[in-house]
Amino acid sequence: MKGLILVGGYGTRLRPLTLTLPKPLVEFGNRPMILHQIEALAAAGVTDIVLAVNYRPEVMVSTLKKYEEEYGVSITFSVEEEPLGTAGPLKLAEEVLKKDDSPFFVLNSDVICDYPFKELADFHKAHGAAGTIVATKVDEPSKYGVIVHDRDTPNLIDRFVEKPVEFVGNRINAGLYILNPSVIDLIEMRPTSIEKETFPILVEQKQLYSFDLEGYWMDVGQPKDFLSGTCLYLTSLSKKHPEKLCKEKYVHGGNVLIDPTAKIHPSALIGPNVTIGPNVVVGEGARIQRSVLLANSQVKDHAWVKSTIVGWNSRIGKWARTEGVTVLGDDVEVKNEIYVNGAKVLPHKSISSNVEKESIIM
């Protein structure tokens, strides 16, 4: 089987982290985000994976090629000279995706969930139509494009309603698909949208079904959702692989994932919902909750860190406090006793005065 991951462009929503690394290589759960998807595809029997890239492809190649042998897959990089949207990349990768008659998976690189690839493939084969969209239920469907089903045929999609004013359903496109190779014939080689241009054709032909996703789902393309997605991921990990979570005495409230190379002072209080990466140092009496500490960062004595992404090589000083979805880029220093609330701090900056409201520090 085959799979295509829509890696996309600059990752502007996740800046300042993406000023240092392309978004799919930013660590989520202490592994590059895209590695969760590659692993899930490989586990479902996918042998050929295409990464549709238009930003810093050389970094992606050098980082991800080494995983081919580990996961037993062939990784091909389809490099767009101009951004081709969400459908154009399928046309660009036509040679790989149409090399046999088997269907192929398509997924957005921002999506984190319990990837149901095996079940999705079985469902797709059973109904026999050209395409299947994974659908997830949401609490506020008025913010999304909602899937409306045919009244007579279960799971057959009748139409999409964009940001409905009145309730028509609560299932939305989860950014995961399985498609027959024939779908590529509907796509032109130009910037084009699979959601707005290709799927409506399949709906009109009664060739598009939806498959309900069980469990958690999150598009982690921006900081607040990256943190929320981390909470969901850690909760899932606690149920499926509790042995991977930290059980030390300094863990408070559970759902804490710590790289074995990190050094945590015994008097620190960590959790709930914290990920700590390689070579991180957490000092005496520090308090960390609902946060992500990326590799080589430091939280010094008695600092208080909440709802914060601490970038690589960054340092939070003694008695400092960060909260309010603060994101520190690479090599940022927050000085001792400084308060930071909701700031996005670009790489290599030093914060020596309080930041009391949401702002970008350049």
Swiss-Prot record:
Pfam families: GMPPB_C, NTP_transferase. Keywords: Cell cycle, Cytoplasm, GTP-binding, Nucleotide-binding, Nucleotidyltransferase, Transferase. InterPro entries: GMPPB_C, GMPPB_N, Mannose-1P_guanyltransferase, NTP_transferase_dom, Nucleotide-diphossugar_trans. It catalyses: alpha-D-mannose 1-phosphate + GTP + H(+) = GDP-alpha-D-mannose + diphosphate. SUPFAM superfamilies: Nucleotide-diphospho-sugar transferases (SSF53448). CDD domains: M1P_guanylylT_B_like_N (cd06425). GO terms for biological process: cell wall mannoprotein biosynthetic process; GDP-mannose biosynthetic process; protein glycosylation. Its main location: cytoplasm. Pathway: Nucleotide-sugar biosynthesis; GDP-alpha-D-mannose biosynthesis; GDP-alpha-D-mannose from alpha-D-mannose 1-phosphate (GTP route): step 1/1. Its EC number is 2.7.7.13. It is found in: Cytoplasm. Belongs to the transferase hexapeptide repeat family. This is Mannose-1-phosphate guanyltransferase. The gene is MPG1.
